[in-house]
Amino acid sequence: MALAALAAQDCRPRAPLLPRAELAQNLAALPGWKHAGKALNKSFAFDDYYRTMAFVNAVAFVAHRQDHHPDLSVHYNRVDVVFSTHDAGGVTLNDCICAAKVESLAGSP
């Protein structure tokens, strides 16, 4: 599924774990995102703290609207974003949807 198609979706309650093939297909549409353990993660770099925090606030807005919240590690010029569906015990379509929405915030095509 393409990045724009993923980003256009909304999260669904009680999403099941993604099968490996579907996870691999979705990851192919998410530039720079990695599957590690039971999560998707990516680091985003910025020129300064102001831009870093603006991105964090934008991610918070998306997470609130989707009711799907990432773990964030905030640094001076970097944000590490980790999505996992804890209730499902790993990665679901909701994680891919939110990763695509976050990717769109960062300005990827």
Where are these regions (language model features)?
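Charge-rich alpha-helical segments
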Residues: 1-109
